[in-house]
Every structure is written in structure tokens, then in C-alpha cells.
């Protein structure tokens, strides 16, 4: 009985885990190196070691890579508003939502890099504004579901998203060492102080 020896001229590629994470890392690197507008999906996929088809399994387009967590964040905040104590004021319910955000905003370096990319492209800045507007709408709906009327629900939601944004900008600022949650709580107190009569 003879045996057959098979020789491979090319090394066989082994499946690598975490395609999504590798795509996100490759995209960030390329956006910083070449600019968002000059980076293609093909380049991102190649750098990540996957096909373009794999890219589109995870992301609708290259812009959405930067906002992939938006729906999760929105749901987290809406759930926190809904779960706030029944006697909570609208701003206290919004405060619960901001506390919830503090549990996901922990990777400061990634957040700084992501914001650098967004700040470099006007279409990404526009997308970010749209996402914040949708967040405010969702929070207002959650407040209305708690029995908060208008305009109080929309005012509290817009104020909360304002605190959310200012806290984020403060958190990613060079030299900051405080957590997002601590900054957001401090700003919410400042917001309450601003609205009190002097």
C-alpha cells in the first residue's frame, strides 16, 4: 500500500477570532493614517485580514463603524430612565441614564481616537448630531412613558443629552483622569444649580 504526501506551496491560513474587533481596529488605524474620506472598505477588510463580504456582515458602511454602539447606548439610557424610582424627578431619571452611560464609557484611548476621526470629517459630525438628536427623542419618550408631560419631558431629555455631550468632551480632553460617570454627575449638579433662583 502506498501513501500519498501532499505538499502545500502556500501556508494555510487559520481562521482568526474577533473579526469585528479586528475590523474596528483596522478602520481606526486607517482613518488616522489616510483620513476617513480616503479609506475604502476594501482597505479596511484587507488590513483586518477578512473579505469585504465579512465587513458587510458586521457593518452597513464605513461610517457606521464609528457609531455601531449607538443603539445599545440609547437602549441602555432608555432602560435606566424607565427603571428610575417612581418618585424620581425628570432630571433624576435622566441622571440614572447618565450613570448607566458611565458603565460603558471606560476605554478613554479608544474614545479619544474615535472623536479625532469624527472631528476630522463634516459628514461624521453631522451623523453624530443626528444620533444625539435621536437619543434625546428616545429619552423624552421614556420620560413621557413615566407620566412626565410636555414640555418637561423634552426639556429634561435635551438637558440630559447636553450634559451627556459636555461630559464626554470633558472626559476625552487631554490631561483628564476622572471617569465619565464622575464628570457627568458633577455636571448634572451644576445644571441643577444653574436653574435655581439666586
Indicate residue ranges for each PLM-predicted region.
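Basic, helix-initiating cap at the start of DNA-binding domains
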Residues: 1-34, 38-50, 67, 76
Amino acid at each position: 500500500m502506498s501513501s500519498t504526501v501532499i505538499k502545500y506551496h502556500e501556508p494555510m491560513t487559520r481562521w482568526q477570532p474577533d473579526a469585528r474587533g479586528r475590523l474596528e481596529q483596522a478602520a481606526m488605524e486607517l482613518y488616522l493614517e489616510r483620513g476617513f474620506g480616503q479609506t475604502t472598505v476594501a482597505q479596511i477588510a484587507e488590513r483586518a485580514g477578512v473579505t469585504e463580504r465579512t465587513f458587510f456582515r458586521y457593518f452597513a458602511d464605513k461610517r457606521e463603524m464609528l457609531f455601531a454602539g449607538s443603539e445599545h447606548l440609547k437602549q441602555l439610557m432608555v432602560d435606566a430612565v424607565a427603571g428610575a424610582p417612581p418618585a424620581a424627578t425628570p432630571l433624576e431619571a435622566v441622571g440614572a441614564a447618565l450613570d448607566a452611560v458611565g458603565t460603558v464609557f471606560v476605554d478613554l484611548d479608544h474614545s479619544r481616537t474615535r472623536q479625532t476621526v469624527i472631528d476630522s470629517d463634516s459628514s461624521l459630525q453631522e451623523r453624530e448630531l443626528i444620533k444625539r438628536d435621536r437619543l434625546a427623542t428616545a429619552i423624552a419618550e421614556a420620560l413621557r412613558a413615566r407620566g412626565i408631560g410636555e414640555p418637561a419631558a423634552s426639556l429634561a431629555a435635551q438637558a440630559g443629552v447636553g450634559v451627556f455631550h459636555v461630559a464626554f468632551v470633558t472626559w476625552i480632553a487631554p490631561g483628564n483622569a476622572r471617569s465619565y460617570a464622575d464628570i457627568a454627575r458633577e455636571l448634572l449638579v451644576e445644571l441643577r444649580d444653574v436653574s435655581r433662583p439666586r
